[in-house]
């Protein structure tokens, strides 16, 4: 049975003549399968239908060489030698084979593209998972650093409070050593109320007595009281610090600032008063103070 040439087969399958000739020429006339592979790979190229450059043998006034006169099939047949004419049945059979080959090539191409798309999707998911893991690790590192920073700040705060307590204890020990006796006990004996009361306004006031110490009783909001002996020249801030450290709250618990009041005459001591000596504030030789929670400014 006579067969169609490669060019005729491609045209029979529906490819444009110019595109078929271009495919055969660019594949070196290696057969219909090579030409079909080229056509499928380049069917979307914008210049797929542009003609090839004119061969030298087609230049005006140039005679083709004997090798250029050979047909694209490379059969070497002499010019004018005719090929057998195909019957309609043979043409249909050959066209059917070519269409099956085209369908096979198309399936192979689709399968290849599907595999490539699947691989791209796997790569995208893999990159997404890696990005999610990296983001989660970054968040965990930030949370861990924040927790460590909070622990460090808490430890520094507790250490600062401990240093203040130790300073108070050292001051108490120094006062006890200097003046003798126990200082800082809540059950300290009450100081004797000094001086006689004048019987009449016209009576001469007694000579004012100088005191080196003063006894301060502090009444807390919960009904308990603290008693402490201070030097007369100590500032009122020492009394407030003593109250803040001994008012019975748990160590490390946030404590509200306190304000000191005198019962009679009624007086609220200001921040400026905290820098004044107890003697100057009239709290010597003894006084009773009331603790009130200070509203934050």
Curated annotation (Swiss-Prot):
GO terms for molecular function: ATPase binding; K48-linked polyubiquitin modification-dependent protein binding; K6-linked polyubiquitin modification-dependent protein binding; proteasome regulatory particle binding; ubiquitin binding; ubiquitin protein ligase binding. The modification Phosphothreonine is found at residues 207, 229. InterPro entries: UBA, UBA-like_sf, UBA_UBXN1, Ubiquitin-like_domsf, UBX_dom. The keyword Coiled coil applies. Interacts with MAVS; this interaction prevents MAVS oligomerization and thus disrupts the RLR signaling pathway. Interacts with CUL1; this interaction inhibits CUL1-mediated degradation of NF-kappa-B inhibitors. Interacts with BIRC2/c-IAP1; this interaction prevents TNFalpha-stimulated RIP1 ubiquitination and subsequent NF-kappa-B activation. Component of a complex required to couple retrotranslocation, ubiquitination and deglycosylation composed of NGLY1, SAKS1, AMFR, VCP and RAD23B. Interacts with HOMER2. Interacts directly with VCP. The modification Phosphoserine is found at residues 199-200, 270. The keyword tRNA-binding does not apply. One of its GO terms (cellular component) is nucleoplasm. Residues 42-52 have a biased composition (Acidic residues). The UBA domain specifically recognizes and binds 'Lys-6'-linked polyubiquitin chains. It is found in: Cytoplasm. Transmembrane segments: none annotated. This is UBX domain-containing protein 1. Residues 86-122, 137-177 have a biased composition (Basic and acidic residues). Residues 2-42 form the UBA domain.
């Amino acid at each position: 049975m006579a067969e169609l040439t490669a060019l005729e087969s491609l045209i029979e399958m529906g490819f444009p003549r110019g595109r078929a000739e271009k495919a055969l020429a660019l594949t070196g006339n290696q057969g219909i399968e090579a030409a079909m592979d080229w056509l499928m790979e380049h069917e979307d190229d914008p210049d797929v239908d542009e003609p090839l450059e004119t061969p030298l043998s087609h230049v005006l006034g140039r005679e083709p060489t004997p090798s250029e006169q050979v047909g694209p099939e490379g059969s070497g047949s002499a010019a004018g030698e005719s090929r057998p004419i195909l019957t309609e049945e043979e043409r249909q059979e050959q066209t059917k084979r070519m269409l099956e080959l085209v369908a096979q090539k198309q399936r192979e191409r689709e399968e290849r593209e599907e595999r490539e798309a699947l691989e791209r999707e796997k790569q995208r998911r893999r990159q997404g998972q890696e990005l999610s893991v990296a983001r989660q690790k970054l968040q965990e590192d930030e949370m861990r650093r924040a927790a460590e920073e909070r622990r460090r700040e808490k430890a520094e705060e507790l250490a600062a409070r401990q240093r203040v307590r130790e300073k108070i204890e050292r001051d108490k020990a120094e006062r006890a050593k200097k003046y003798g006796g126990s200082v800082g006990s809540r059950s300290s004996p009450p100081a004797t109320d000094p001086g006689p009361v004048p019987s009449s306004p016209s009576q001469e006031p007694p000579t004012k007595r100088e005191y080196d110490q003063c006894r301060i009783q502090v009444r807390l909001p919960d009904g308990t009281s603290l008693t402490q002996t201070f030097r007369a020249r100590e500032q009122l801030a020492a009394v407030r610090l003593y109250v803040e450290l001994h008012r019975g709250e748990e160590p490390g618990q946030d404590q509200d600032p306190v304000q000191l009041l005198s019962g009679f005459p009624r007086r609220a001591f200001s921040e400026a008063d905290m820098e004044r000596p107890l003697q100057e504030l009239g709290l010597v030789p003894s006084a009773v103070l009331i603790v009130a929670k200070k509203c934050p400014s």
